[in-house]
Curated annotation (Swiss-Prot):
Residues 626-640 have a biased composition (Basic and acidic residues). Keywords: ATP-binding, Chaperone, Nucleotide-binding, Phosphoprotein, Stress response. Pfam families: HSP70. This is Chaperone protein DnaK. Belongs to the heat shock protein 70 family. Residues 602-640 are annotated as: Disordered.
Amino acid sequence: MGKIIGIDLGTTNSCVSVLEGNEPIVITNSEGKRTTPSVVAFVDGGERKVGDPAKRQAITNPTKTIYSIKRFMGETYDQVSREVERVPFKVVRGDNNTPRVDIDGRLYTPQEISAMILQKMKKTAEDYLGQEVTEAVITVPAYFNDAQRQATKEAGEIAGLKVRRIVNEPTAASLAYGLDKSNKDMKIAVFDLGGGTFDISILELGDGVFEVKSTNGDTHLGGDDFDHVIIDWLAEEFKSQEGVDLRQDPMAMQRLKEAAEKAKIELSSTSSTEINLPYIMPVNGIPKHLVMTLTRAKFEQLADRLIQACVAPCETALKDAGMSRGDIDEVILVGGSTRIPAIQEIVEKIFGKAPSKGVNPDEVVAVGAAIQGGVLTGEVKDVLLLDVTPLSLGIETMGGVMTRLIDANTTIPTKKSEIFTTAVDNQPSVEIHVLQGERSLAKDNKSIGRFNLDGIAPAPRQTPQIEVTFDIDANGILNVTAHDKATGKKQNIRIEASSGLSDDEIKRMKEEAQANAEADKKEKERIDKINQADSMIFQTEKQLKELGDKFPADKKAPIDTALDKLKEAHKAQDVAAIDTAMAELQTALTAAGEELYKNVGAAQGGAQPGPDFGGAQGPSVGDQPSDDKNVTDVDFEEVK
């Protein structure tokens, strides 16, 4: 059985891990880093960059550099209107009222962009393992709804991965934290504040069982929001000084974003930081600079609303778990934003104890996902993960009311059935409107799917018996069935349409992603070949300069001809022509080297070390064995 990798698909950064000899290993990417920025850039010429290379060019290419795409996953366009206004790239309304990223007229779904990041993580794992990877455990925020979970699963499929399990991020973190403590009975709180989402989960650990008792959170609260309070402060200060709003210029906005993120990070370890952005924007033809000092106290004042927003979900989670803060043995911090001192202080205030800092907040979720992968393959034994559904599920009934079938914080997988009936006489069909949320009225909850049960036998109202069954799998994804008990007619829906993508669209996107991966591979091979040619040109010119006068004329001419041909092919970046020219140049260099070696040997009456005429990759003439008569035996004493 192949390896199942664990991927933390984050808003700001992503991380991949794998189990090696029962130990989870965080895999270093091609840039030598253990986490990869969740950034995708489209550059001129159709090239696509992912991770650090994409992030590095963001300032000069703000409208085609995509970040924080996780905040758009599984949402309708109307639900992300605030996010749309914040980002410099263009987001438009697509089919089924879904948000789409517009790059030169080509519309990309959030799932496609996320798939590009997942492909990078997949390739990172394959390079490390030396084998193809086809299966993964991918983590999501605990408070992700059904549509967001399904969108994540689709992103994995588009990336060419079979998603074996969707795991909640705090639950994965608890696995990583508690695996070596599984013989201990503990109650832990996992406080997960990442780049775009906030989760709090209360768990009980003991005898290898990791049982989630409750979960709560906010899928639109995270490090991005802390960045934006700094961005808005900088922009308003500059506007009051210069009368210009920097937020209207995409390039200036990107510079503000990077400066805000850097300042936020610095303020975790220092009491103040200087933000210095020269030539931020010309005003009346005069270039203006932005130089401001931000103190930690001012930052905490700006972010106070966000800090306080963490309190209520924690209190609700404790209440839902039937616990008080005194029952919690350990508080685990997960996500880069938990490094903010004010967040650590509020956590200590909520739970009455200092949080544990025994895990790496950037890597622990991916490590937990890899452990879950090990559970699925059988590598990790005697571990049972009992997760919960974060939100209540039900259907719309007469009067626009939501009737719950499954309550929030129910352990999954789970199945629940209820009998419903018709509202009017001789009603031929019923519409099942599936909802997710905690509000009493249907309109106030998230609509995650609709389907019809047709062919109901004519009967007076309230006579037919329609059995509606909700079935949630271990991924937290819902399957709904409606069954007319009188006629035996049955209709079911796997809630996939809520993400806005049909099976055909997913298939097309998967094929495109595979084609792009192949194109990326060919592009790398092309660049490598051009670099080889460049190296061969340099080495050949160097050798001609050093030894050219020693060549017989009839051997030097073919080298000059082949070298000129290679230079032309290199300039044109014609890979086929480069291959031919390199082969010709190699042949000419080898022939010249042999001739020169022969001449030197004849002149000196014996074999001497010959010059290297292999170009960038040719053979070298090595040192020859020396005559034994010239060898002197020497005694030596080892000094210790």
